[in-house]
């Protein structure tokens, strides 16, 4: 192969790669998921979880991939509790608000401590289907539940 043919091959491959990249960006914008930005007016689903008698009620939550979701945890007990999200919020954006105290580690949200009569809201958009267990990790509190994310 001579030098001229090699240059044309290199430029041809580069052009094809640029065209594929451009087309993938164009089609991706039409399929965008909701965001957490205040300007995004996508309606959200609200699910209230009561914490009472050392239980999460309801214990099983069902949400959909791509649906903006707000989980509202209300601690009705006279004692402190925690919400440990497991892998539910891994790799996605989320917002935490309310009277709970969020704790973070290198992987993201470790847990939220919920005082008696406290409330914490967690806003997120589920990205992957699956079953995501959550629990309270305080000593002696055997409380757990799960979020089922469906397509």
Model-identified regions with their sequence ranges:
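Short, acidic/polar linear motifs in exposed loop/turn regions
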Residues: 77-79, 128
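Short aromatic-acidic-glycine turn motif
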Residues: 89-100
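Bacterial N-terminal signal peptides
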Residues: 13-24
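N-terminal edge beta-strand
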Residues: 40-68
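Beta-strand signatures of extracellular beta-sandwich domains
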Residues: 82-86
């Amino acid at each position: 192969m001579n030098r001229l043919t090699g240059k044309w091959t290199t430029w041809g491959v580069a052009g094809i790669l640029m065209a594929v990249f451009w087309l993938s960006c164009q089609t991706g914008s039409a399929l965008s998921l909701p965001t957490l930005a205040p300007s995004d007016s996508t309606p959200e689903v609200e699910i209230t979880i009561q914490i009472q008698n050392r239980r999460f009620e309801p214990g099983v939550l069902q949400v959909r991939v791509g649906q903006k979701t707000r989980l509202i945890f209300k601690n009705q007990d006279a004692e402190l509790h925690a919400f440990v999200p497991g892998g539910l919020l891994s790799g996605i954006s989320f917002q935490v608000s309310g009277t709970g105290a969020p704790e973070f580690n290198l992987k993201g949200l470790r847990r939220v401590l919920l005082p008696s009569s406290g409330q914490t809201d967690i806003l997120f958009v589920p990205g992957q289907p699956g079953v995501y267990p959550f629990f309270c990790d305080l000593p002696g509190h055997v409380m757990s539940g799960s979020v089922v994310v469906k397509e």
